Design a protein with these regions (language model features):
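Non-transmembrane domains of secretory- and envelope-associated proteins
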Residues: 22-24, 146, 156-160, 167-172, ...
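Short beta-strand segments that buttress and anchor functional surface loops
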Residues: 31-38, 62-67, 79-86, 108, ...
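A short, amphipathic edge element
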Residues: 45-47, 136-151, 194-197
């Protein structure tokens, strides 16, 4: 399955996409991911998760939706463990900004502990599994990928189109919205049906107050403050 996910990222790394709008509209969304693989033992294993996602200007905020009882239990165990505390980036909201100079700033907001990790240096991106691909962060997939794909004449929402690419033993499909400048659906699957991945975007109203405007009371930290 990792090969499927990597193919989506690699196919569109450096190309340009002429239909891409100069300004991407501000959006709020809920994203659902589904990852399924059938192993050699015949057992199908499926992972399903969701996240809140927000794009405003050159800022993108994403936060995995974790049921409160599970989050409470995790933090109770983690915080009660003696010794140095490590940063669990999966439990925090990720905040990525592109500055005027074209540089990315990566931050994490931990609402449970009221902490803002405002400095994640590039050499530590691997610690939080972060890939500094702004096109992919801003648009969920690199729009250049569409140039490698075939446009399909299938039913789709207004100002949206299905695209498909078959390569080797797998197929990738993207439902791209030119209006919203992002994919509404991404599907990738092996042709034998034993591996599949799906991402589905549901648009939501923009919040009245942006999440990064609510961090004044947060303690400011550097990611390296969590290192042993």
């Amino acid at each position: 399955m990792m090969r499927l996910l990597l193919s989506i990222w690699l196919l569109g790394c450096t190309l340009s996409f002429p239909l891409l709008a100069d300004e991407a509209p501000d959006l709020a969304a809920r994203i659902r991911y589904q990852d399924r693989i059938t192993g050699n033992d015949g057992i199908a294993r499926e992972s399903v998760w969701q996240e809140k996602w927000l794009r405003v200007g050159n800022q993108v905020w994403s936060q995995r939706l974790i049921p409160l009882p599970l989050a409470r239990a995790y933090h109770a165990t983690h915080d009660a463990t003696p010794g140095h505390k490590h940063f669990t980036h999966q439990m925090a909201a990720r905040w990525v900004t592109l500055d005027d100079g074209g540089d990315l700033q990566l931050r994490y907001a931990d609402a449970w502990h009221n902490q803002l990790v405002e400095e994640v240096p590039p050499e530590e991106y691997g610690q939080v599994a972060f890939k500094p691909d702004w096109e992919r962060i801003r648009y969920l997939v690199n729009p250049a990928l569409l140039q490698e794909m075939t446009r399909l004449d299938e039913q789709a929402p207004e100002q949206a189109r299905w695209y498909e690419k078959r390569e080797g033993k797998q197929r990738t499909r993207i439902l791209w919205s030119s209006r919203w400048q992002l994919p509404l659906v991404v599907e990738s699957a092996s042709l034998d049906g034993y591996r599949s991945y799906r991402m589905e975007v549901t648009l939501k109203p923009l919040p009245r107050q942006l999440p990064w405007q609510q961090l004044d009371s947060y303690q400011t930290l550097d990611l390296r403050d969590f290192f042993d």
